[in-house]
């Protein structure tokens, strides 16, 4: 989805960045509300610059209004699921190695059983545990929530008794 939002003046069409959200420095800025439209953690691609007026920014120096497109969220999947264009069921890793440089992308906080469309396969990841993993850009499509009511009705996805097969 394309949006017109503030981008640093030096960004050019095709540049990508990860939105980190607004900072305490942003208090009182006239563009703060526009910057809050960025989804924290998402990758955006600059499609073009729309505005000619440069605005002062305490974080980036100068910004202009630019057309940006949501690309997706960086995450790490098992290699067997990393197929460009595929929609897969994503469950975050239970890894507890918070010192691993890939930990954040392996344990994305979306919850369990999220349908994710793999937009782009980026690279293989060297997992300290030796697991075959790949970094991708994904877009959440649907979240399936198991409720007690669905399990009792047999719609929990685990057979008639609501148990794992």
From Swiss-Prot:
InterPro entries: UPF0179. Pfam families: UPF0179. It comes from the Archaea. PANTHER family: UPF0179 PROTEIN MJ1627. Belongs to the UPF0179 family. This is UPF0179 protein Igni_1272. It comes from Ignicoccus hospitalis (strain KIN4/I / DSM 18386 / JCM 14125).
């Amino acid at each position: 989805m394309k949006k017109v939002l503030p981008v640093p003046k030096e960004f050019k069409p095709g540049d990508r960045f990860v939105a980190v959200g607004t900072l305490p420095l942003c208090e009182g800025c006239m563009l703060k509300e526009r910057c809050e439209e960025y989804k924290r953690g998402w990758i955006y691609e600059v499609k073009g610059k729309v505005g000619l007026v440069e605005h002062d920014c305490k974080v980036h120096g100068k910004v202009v209004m630019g057309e940006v497109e949501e690309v997706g969220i960086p995450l790490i999947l098992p290699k067997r699921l990393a197929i460009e264009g595929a929609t897969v069921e994503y469950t975050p890793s239970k890894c507890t190695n918070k010192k691993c440089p890939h930990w954040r992308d392996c344990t994305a906080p979306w919850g369990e059983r999220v349908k994710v469309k793999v937009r782009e396969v980026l690279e293989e990841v060297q997992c300290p545990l030796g697991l075959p993993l790949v970094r991708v850009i994904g877009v959440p499509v649907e979240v399936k929530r198991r409720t007690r009511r669905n399990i009792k009705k047999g719609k929990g996805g685990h057979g008639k008794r609501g148990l794992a097969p």
